[in-house]
């Protein structure tokens, strides 16, 4: 008697699994996230979880790096914009949309959450976060300097101070998102920040 055909197993999407793990660490913290929590969220057996990622600490490290790349991409795409007001808009507005993605269980940014503080992984999270922020600041400052050179910004504009202001608003949005602020409130703040930096839109 022929055996009934079984459905094909669900394909393993590593990037999706890493983002799901990141959101779980984000919501519960590193210490508060158990292996059972991870297997349930990712739909993997314990042996498959360890086979794919090695250990909880290694999964955390890879999840942090994968999540961080999303913000690196936001900045790199932003600075490629044709004008500086659009650069600022993309950095702030696109980040708010990322902080508050509908499929997240908790809003905000993993890299600035408590999950980083209680991690016992070998990843130096503080140094890694500093490196990422340093990269983002450098490319944003270079874009501001170009805007000054091309006459888009006033010749006496301070590119470093301007970059610091944008980054400060970004960090504030991230912190408020971690505290549960909703998307509409964060977008209002981001848009006000954009207006203060770039001026009101032309009528």
Residue ranges and their predicted role:
Residues 76-107, 159-166:
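Hydrophobic alpha-helical connector segments
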Residues 94, 107-116, 157-176, 188-196:
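Hydrophobic alpha-helical segments that form the core
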Residues 90, 123-150, 161, 188:
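Amphipathic alpha-helical packing segments from all-alpha helical-bundle domains
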Residues 98-102, 116, 146, 166-183, ...:
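Amphipathic C-terminal alpha-helical segment
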Residues 88, 102-126:
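Amphipathic alpha-helical segments used for helix-helix packing
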Residues 13-22, 38-39, 63-67, 71, ...:
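Generic hydrophobic, amphipathic alpha-helix propensity
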Residues 1-12, 201-203:
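N-terminal intrinsically disordered/low-complexity leader segments
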């Amino acid at each position: 008697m022929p055996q009934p055909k079984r459905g094909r197993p669900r394909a393993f999407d590593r990037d999706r699994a890493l983002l799901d793990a990141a959101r779980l660490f984000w919501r519960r913290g590193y210490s508060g996230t158990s292996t059972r929590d991870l297997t349930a969220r990712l739909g993997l057996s314990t042996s498959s979880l360890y086979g794919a990622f090695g250990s909880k600490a290694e999964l955390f490290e890879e999840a942090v790096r994968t999540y961080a790349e999303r913000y690196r991409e936001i900045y790199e795409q932003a600075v490629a914009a044709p004008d500086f007001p659009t650069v600022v808009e993309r950095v702030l507005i696109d980040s708010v949309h990322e902080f508050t993605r509908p499929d997240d269980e908790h809003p905000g940014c993993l890299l600035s959450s408590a999950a980083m503080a209680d991690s016992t992984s070998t990843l130096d999270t503080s140094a890694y976060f500093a490196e990422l922020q340093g990269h983002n600041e450098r490319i944003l400052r270079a874009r501001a300097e170009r805007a000054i050179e091309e006459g888009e910004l006033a010749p006496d504009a301070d590119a470093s101070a301007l970059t610091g202001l944008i980054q400060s608003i970004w960090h504030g949005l991230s912190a408020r998102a971690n505290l549960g602020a909703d998307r509409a409130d964060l977008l209002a703040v981001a848009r006000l920040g954009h207006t203060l930096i770039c001026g009101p839109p032309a009528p």
